[in-house]
Amino acid sequence: MIYEWRTYEAMPGKLPALHTHLEVAAGLFKKHELGVLGFWTEEIGIGGQVTYMWIYADFEERQKKVAAFGADPAWKQQVAEETEKEGVIVARTHNTMLQLTPYSPVPRLKMNVQEWRIYDAMPGKLPDLHTRFATHTLRLFEKHGMANIGYWTEVFGTSNRLVYMLGYPSLGDREKSWATFQTDRDWQQARAESEKNGPLVAKTYTRILRPTAYSPKG
């Protein structure tokens, strides 16, 4: 399976129009059997953008379904006559192609808040980072009330990157879970053992997300 992470940056003042645009798109994605994990906005940090994740079996399926979606008269009417009648609403689009790691669960959204985390591994350390997550981290996240939604690597290029998503009932629950996780002796031991030859992670990026009203449930 391929997972496509897409972020749309709205033109100034156009975020409401972008939501309208994507709410219509969500219905047409379903019509054309384009799987969607969810639609999100930033809970903390950058505003004015919406992110969603497509799911498809392979790139051939993507090409066929996206072509059918783009040719749908209902979509053309929505773009030409409705959301963009007063100008372009999207300033920039970013997308990343991802594939699940062997230890990832099948992604499901069951909680109110999601956290998108990107770890750039130290050179040559990505296999060790995968081992730590598969052997220790996922289990300890669950122990401390964090939902393991999905774990991915990038499809193209020579990326040294691990991407994953966690879920929480609320922002307060997120704070509590991370606090107890960081002080867990099992985690401290696992981290120390995995880093005895040096740190595994060079940089970490985090986004706190909340599903939109039109995001699929469950």
What are these regions (language model features)?
Residues 1-189, 193-218:
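Short S/T/G/P-rich N-terminal loop/turn motif that feeds into the first structured element of a domain
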